[in-house]
Structures are given as C-alpha cells and as structure tokens.
C-alpha cells in the first residue's frame, strides 16, 4: 500500500470515529484479548470465589455483557466463527481440525479487515485454534492472511509437563483434569511471555493505528500457573456447585454424553475440589496478565485511543449438573462466556448489559466502532447501540450448536437462548429435547420440554431454532475423533 493511500485511509478513519463519538479523535487502536476456556468465574460477574481485580477494573471502565453466547462451545469452530463473523453452518467448521478457508477461501477476517484499512495487524499467542499444550510455540491452526506480524512464545510450562498432576492418566493432559502449581515467575510462563511481547508491540506501534490480538492459553487444561495464585484459594473455601439429587432424571442422555456421563469422571470429591482450585488459580493468573496490559496502555498514554475487547472462546463447566466438566455442552455454563468492551468515549461505559448477544456480533461491532466497512456476507449484528445505552431493550436471541460423539454415534445439538427461555434439540429432537425457564430456573435444573403446558412455547422456539441453525449431523466433512 502506498503512503498516500495509507494516509487517506487513516484520515477517513479519523472522520468516522469523530462522527461516531461526536468528538475529535484519532483512529482507534484495538487490543483484542482472548482467554481460553474461561467461564464467568470472575468477581465482576458475581462469582464469590474468584479474585480478579484487573478484569473487574476493565469491567468498571467499559461495558460488561452478562449474557454473551458463543456459536459452538469448542475452540476451533467458535474462534473461526467469531473472527470471520460467519456462523459454523456457513463455515462448515464443527471440529478441531477443519480450517474455515476450506469452505470460505475468500473470507475477510476481522484482523484482515484492519490490514486492508492500513492498520498494523498483529497476533501474540492463541487467537485461532491451537492444540494445548502440544502446539504452544507454533502457529497452530492460524490464518496467515489475518496478520502482518505474529509472535509465538513458548514458556517454562512447556518444559515442565512431566511435573503435572493428571487425575486421568488414560487421557492426555490437554483433555484431563490436570494441573501444576509452578515455581518461578509470571514472565517465565507462556502467558506471561505473551503479555511481555504484546506490551513490546504496543510500544513499537504506538504512533500508528494497530489491531493487536493477544491470546492467552489459560485456563485451558493443563491448569499451569505460578504457585502464588494457588495461595489465593485455600482448598477449604472451594465448593462444588449445587444440583438437586435428581437433576439428570428429566434430561436426555445426549445432554451429558462425552462430557461426564459419569459424574465428575468418577473421581473423588477431594480431587475435583483440587482441580477447581487449580482452575481458579489460573483465572487469577490470566487476570494479572490483563492488569499488565492495562498498566502498559496507561503508561504509554494509549488508553484514550485504544478500544479493548476481552472475551473467552466459550464457557466451561466446573462440576455443574452433578459433575459436568469442561465444554461441548449446551447448558448455560458452556454456551455463555465473558465479554467486556471498553471504547473511549462510549456513553455506556461503567455499566453492564443484560441483553442477549452473540459472539458472531463482535466483528460488525468492532468494525463500526473503528469506522471500517465489514463484508456484506457477515452474519452478526452490530451491538454498538448497546454500548451507547446498555439498558436499552435489544430483544436478542443466541444460537449455539454442539456436534460431538453421543451414545456411540455423532449427535448434533442446537440451542436457542432468549431473555427467558433456553430450548435445545438433539438431532432435531430424536435424541431428546430440553426447555428451561430462566425466569425461575437459572440453574437449568427442571426440563419442561415434555410438559404439555409448555407445548406452545416449544413450538415457537423450535420454529425459530430450525430457521437459523442446522440441527442434524452435517453432510460436510468433519473428524469424529476431533469433536
């Protein structure tokens, strides 16, 4: 790109951001922070155990979304969807191995859009999918067209895997409940190195517009972080979540298959409490890295010219419903995830929104805030109006899918979340139905799908769900072993 074209684009972005916020400003930088497998185990989201002062600080600065939902609670498809603005059914990506460009070779990703507008587009760590921990330090399943600079740190954690406690030795540490309270400093761990490199890139590019993707690997298993973060969570303060004794009695087997069909993997409660302690320690470790990024922005005087978006690829189970762990489910804990926007000058800053939003909405939102025109084909909806007025009525709906092994054969789950209801079908109901009333059952303990009193609700939600997402096993290629 010639310097003249670059100057014209930058001037155009200046005008666009001025028009949007009603005050002079230079083009916004974007600090796009991703965490891996982080559920709403954050103090500002109401978690009574979590110690997360820096994410709380970011929430106080910006707009926290309490009801943000991923498109698939699995690393590769959710990240591909979020970064392209296209739903999994459009990308034909449902597993951990298929690249979105196999189906959409000409897709323009969110960071690629910034490149087209003359920004530096940079990545440190995990934005697209990586196998964790074995692909740490590589490009993973990256998209080279998205970036003009990438950094792949590889820390001490990758050299000490032999020290990790694995509660399920028959499974790899990437999938098992496994952890290490590590010796050494934050900066020696991969995520600490990611933070250091991100700060370096912000400093080097402080005088030109940048899009910087910062992708942390934690709290994905194995839960590895410096020992000092374990000290924040005495084991006697860790509790397993409440569930009625008969919680699973009215739920289809497909709702649990592949994710703890046997509660807590059959492990002793003392062990799963240690796993939960390790997860929280990793959350606080990631929180500390976010704090380093915020401090760096302030010290560089970039806070007033940088949008910050913090998100996790999906939610995560920590023993809910009598012992579900990890992801790939369509309950609230797996489908919902943290989302915090800080935009300089946004009128909604310092508040929270209860409106239903989807991760596919991030692409058009970030583009609009920066004065960029996204591709016409993207399927999300800009939530800029909520950032300006978080208490507005949005009437959003979220659609989440999960393709995975179930009772020996692949099964597709599809779920719609409205402000009141969650309705879920497994293979369009052939493998079970679920309906939960969030007005009085936020824990999703009572399945109303087969209650005749709710037949009309089921019919209405079924029509909406089937009109938007695939509810059966797809004909497109997928790897059954990598669901």
How does the language model describe each region?
Residues 2-5, 14, 19-427, 431-433, ...:
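Formylglycine-dependent sulfatase
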């Amino acid at each position: 790109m010639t310097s003249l074209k670059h100057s014209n684009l930058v001037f155009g972005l200046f005008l666009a951001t001025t028009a949007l916020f009603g005050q002079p400003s230079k083009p916004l930088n974007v600090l796009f922070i991703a965490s891996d497998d982080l559920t709403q185990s954050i103090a500002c989201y109401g978690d009574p155990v979590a110690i997360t002062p820096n994410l709380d600080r970011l929430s106080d600065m910006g707009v926290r979304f309490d009801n943000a939902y991923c498109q698939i609670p699995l690393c590769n498809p959710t990240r591909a969807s979020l970064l392209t603005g296209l739903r999994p059914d459009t990308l034909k990506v449902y597993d951990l191995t298929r690249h979105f460009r196999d189906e959409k070779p000409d897709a323009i990703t969110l960071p690629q859009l910034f490149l087209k507008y003359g920004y530096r587009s940079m990545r440190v760590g995990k934005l697209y999918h990586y196998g964790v921990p074995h692909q740490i330090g590589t490009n993973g399943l990256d998209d080279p067209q998205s970036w003009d600079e990438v950094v792949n740190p590889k820390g001490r954690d990758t050299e000490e895997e032999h020290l990790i406690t694995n509660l399920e030795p028959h499974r790899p540490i990437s999938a098992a409940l496994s952890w290490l309270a590590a010796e050494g400093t934050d900066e020696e761990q991969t995520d600490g190195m990611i933070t250091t490199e991100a700060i370096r890139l912000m400093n080097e590019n402080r005088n030109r517009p940048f899009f910087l993707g910062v992708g942390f690997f934690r709290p994905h298993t194995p839960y590895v972080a410096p020992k000092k973060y374990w000290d924040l969570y005495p084991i006697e303060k860790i509790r397993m979540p409440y569930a009625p004794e008969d919680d699973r009695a009215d739920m289809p087997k497909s709702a649990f298959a592949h994710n703890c069909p046997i509660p807590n993997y059959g492990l002793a409660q003392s062990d799963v409490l240690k796993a939960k302690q390790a997860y929280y320690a990793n959350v606080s470790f990631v929180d500390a890295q976010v704090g380093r990024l915020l401090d760096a922005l302030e010290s560089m005087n970039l806070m007033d010219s940088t949008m910050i978006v913090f998100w996790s690829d999906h939610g995560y189970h920590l023993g809910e419903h009598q012992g579900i762990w990890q992801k790939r489910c369509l309950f609230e804990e797996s489908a919902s995830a943290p989302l915090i926007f800080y935009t300089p000058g946004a009128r909604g800053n310092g508040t929270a929104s209860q409106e239903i939003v989807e991760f596919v909405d991030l692409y058009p939102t970030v583009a609009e805030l920066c004065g960029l025109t996204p591709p016409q084909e993207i399927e999300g909806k800009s939530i800029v109006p909520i950032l300006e007025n978080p208490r507005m009525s949005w009437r959003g709906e979220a659609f989440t899918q999960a393709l995975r092994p179930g009772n020996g054969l692949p099964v597709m789950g599809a779920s719609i979340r409205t402000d009141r209801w969650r309705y879920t079908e497994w293979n369009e109901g052939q493998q079970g139905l679920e309906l939960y009333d969030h007005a009085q059952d936020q824990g999703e303990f009572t399945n109303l799908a087969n209650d005749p009193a709710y037949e009309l609700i089921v019919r209405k939600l079924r029509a909406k769900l089937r009109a938007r997402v695939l509810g059966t096993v797809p004909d497109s290629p997928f790897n059954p072993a990598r669901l």
